[in-house]
Amino acid sequence: MNDPSARRVRFSGLGSLPGVDFRAAVAMTFDKVPGLPYLPELPARGPWVGMVGRGLGLLVGLDVELLAGEWRLGVPGIDHRRSRATWRDDVDRLEELAQGYAGAFKVSVAGPWTLAAATGVAHT
């Protein structure tokens, strides 16, 4: 381990931030966490952009809906489409805001156990 960069400690953020201003949140992550900026979540923009909504929006082949504050599998809903659309929009805006940045970058997404625990099954 003679490579000094291999011993360097990095830190980053978890993802969720208050507010609804995506541009300001991204700028803050680049400013405050320059070693490993991250794609922020802004759950105040709606449930489809929080940790669970974002993760479910990335699933392919599984339909979900949000009903009375609970995500449910098996039914295609507008919130699932919103989650996917917001993800695409966030990544596009991130690309614009990160022009010229060439370092490491963190994107965190809820894993399968978190999504399973936060999702119910629609009863038909």
Question: Locations of the language-model features?
Answer:
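Alpha/beta catalytic barrel-like cores
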Residues: M1-H123
